[in-house]
Amino acid sequence: MTPEKFQMFENRLLKNYKHRLKQAKRLNVTCWRLYDHDLPEFPICVELYEEYIYIAEYNRRHALTDEEHGIWFEETKKIIADMTGVPIDKMFVKLRKRMSHREGQYEKEAVTESKIITVQENGLQFLVNLTDYLDTGLFLDHRVTRQMVQAEAKDTHFLNLFSYTSSF
């Protein structure tokens, strides 16, 4: 990977960070997506949850050796850490790969201690699990849907049977 490619990634990250940080403050949310596979050379999704970062790397074919890939990923994490101020030891990394029949998507992954934190969104609190599963349990791209349900379901009770996380 050339220095120019890393510079492109850093520039994109900075642009996204400035815009989305302002937006997060305006919306009073403590969890938001910083980057979503915007550049083909960086097939990752980067999400901020309070003072933690969740990185999902999309498995793909590439011409990098295992060693080169390791160097690429460490440099990528360093750029993210420098940009956000979140240290690498507060980053949680998952590998997303194509699954036939979605086997394993909802299976517990972690063999380490669970890291579950509380995040804020639209006056609500959600628990997110950064370690145990492929997903955190809170899908950030569904924020508008949650806002709609929050407005429509005011002063009512309902049971969400369509989401294994209960947060959609």
Give names to the regions the model predicted:
Residues M1-Y54, Y58-R60:
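Non-catalytic accessory regions of SAM-dependent methyltransferases
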Residues F6-V29, D66, G70-V93:
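Cysteine-centered catalytic environments shared across enzyme families
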Residues C45-E47, I71-F139, Q147:
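Non-catalytic substrate-recognition/targeting regions of SAM-dependent transferases
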Residues I53-Y54, H62, F126, D135:
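Short, acidic Gly/Pro/Ser/Thr-rich loop/turn segments
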Residues A56-G70:
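Short histidine-centered catalytic/ligand-binding loop motif
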Residues L140-T156:
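Conserved alpha-helix/loop element of class I SAM-dependent methyltransferases that forms part
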Residues A151-F168:
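Conserved SAM/SAH cofactor-binding pocket of Class I
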